[in-house]
């Protein structure tokens, strides 16, 4: 009957969802709301949702952009299993091939819509070294340092003995305090577990700080508390100087129809995105959106800049330029916090 058929279909869908949840190790997240998931957890959930349809080909657009290194390695291992065990063809676009490079059967480099290189991973890396393409900086460190272009730690280990290390620079004296957290406790709901518990720290002027941690460890939550967007239920936040936040979902900042209505022309020029001035901000790529959002944050003139994944979606050359820009800001007395 029709009713029995509907029941069977629902059971089949539920069974397939359960299989995908187990394959991607998502069982601990099944009772969570999607809004409470971290960026990396949402990415894994999206991949699992795509696989419920049993596709033969997966097209993934920057799938590792929101993943920490440990989660990225796990994600890539899942993709490798999908390819090797289930025969799924995987085509992945990325600005940072990194660990994925060694697992690929072939790599294609696009420049202005044209294919400038297509080869196996090692030949691809050698071609980048010979051409001096800016994407060279996106290769694993070993492939940049050595002519043998090792793509994995195992390949690079025999060559590491030839390296000589420089001593680390002496630490600079601390400046004035620009942000202080004292015994901060935060939870998204009254009966939920604490995301931040009795956290204390002090930031000083002219420094660049990094916040690292696995997906779901509370990095973005901490930035939200620092910025005053999220209110802790216990503890104290002191912000004696103006503070600006670049959120993980940068599109929340876009309230105008043109980029040049959001960011000053001089800032667009400094960030190398003046050509985007007349574009609609919601039509931009992920990396372009991050740079426009960063421009908006810089235009506030705030002394403390809280940047959540500012390099997500940026290619190697753009990352290097952004790093130089941030170092210049710190030298000018700004405080930068990076997730």
Enumerate the language-model features and the residues they cover.
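Conserved ABC ATPase "signature" region
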Residues: 12-29, 264-278, 295
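Conserved ABC ATPase signature
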Residues: 33-37, 41, 280-284, 288
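The feature captures the beta-strand-to-loop junction immediately N-terminal to the Walker
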Residues: 212-214
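ABC ATPase C-loop
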Residues: 50-51, 298
